[in-house]
């Protein structure tokens, strides 16, 4: 199995979220590992959350499973049922089609690092707490389907 050199993969903090929903993820830095490794059936990202940053808005995927492994530090997992601290070595999973909106918040004074994997068919999804959804085409829309203005989107 080929070793992946993280330092050789660009680390970015881009987001496609329309304002003001982009503000909470400004301290989220990620590397897209799947494209760099030639993987095409599922996504893998190495993510660093700076103190105070969110991994995303609280969301779910209609057609994609997600699996997360916390590598370093800790973050608060926020889901419909409440808040749970995830520490290094702990995992979380969300099956496709579950509308249990989730995200991580780094409420500590140190960076936290995790790897998240997703697989399935991108058929869109939604956001629990805000007037936002995403389509299979990768665009953001209001819950009523009205598009948001186009913003920067990660490659």
Please give the residue ranges for each predicted region.
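Short acidic-glycine-tyrosine-enriched beta hairpin
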Residues: 80-96
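Short, conserved beta-strand element in jelly-roll/cupin
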Residues: 46-50, 61-77, 117-119
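Conserved short histidine dyad/triad with adjacent acidic residue
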Residues: 29-32, 45-61, 99
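A generic structural motif
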Residues: 65, 72-74, 81, 99, ...
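A short, N-terminal "cap"/entry segment at the start of jelly-roll beta-barrel domains
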Residues: 1-41, 125-155
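Ligand-binding loop in jelly-roll beta-barrel domains
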Residues: 38, 96-123
